[in-house]
Amino acid sequence: SSGLEDGDNANMSTVYDMALLSSYAINNSLYKKIVGTKDITVKTDLKTYVWHNKNRLLSSYKYCVGGKTGFTERARRTLVTNASKDGVNLTVVTFNDGNDFGDHKDLYEKYFDSLKEYEIVSEGYIDSKYDDSYIDKSFKMSLSKDEFKRIRKEISYYENSASKVVGRVSVSLDGKEYFSEDIYIKDRVKKEEVNLSFWQRLIKRLKELW
């Protein structure tokens, strides 16, 4: 499919579709370099060619890191841009907007002022019922103060797990899960067992088996 709206093989995308795609793509270093390039010069034996990126925000807004302009008959002027400030990464998409560059800048300024990056889960050791429990990944979110208050972090444990994976930690906001990761342990000793003698731990294990 071509991405255009007309013809037998037409397809359509929403601004939300474009925002998801661009937010994912900007994490690719090559893509980010391409869409973030303001100008490029190519010299041949006969002539020198200079191309200028049509995304004017790259030059007029210092936090813009990439994006793509476009035009179709139905959507008219389309613009997808990405911006980053103080760890907060945002994507703005507009269709049929005659003031798209100005609107994008205004939206960035509005949400950069209201959002902050929070580290919800830190990589490494976590507080749980097992000693030496840890996770392999950290998780950060850009949130308003009110959203941060509504974040829910939950830890669940697997019953009688014989592996080093003893549970999961999950993060949700307003009922939607945004992060889930396994909890590992280096030594299968629960915190309450640390001060038990060898025989006390053995008896406890036998009782669990019975």
Go through each PLM region and give its residues.
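Domain-terminus/edge residues, biased toward the C-terminal soluble/receptor-binding domains
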Residues: N9-W210
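Surface-exposed aromatic
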Residues: S1-G7
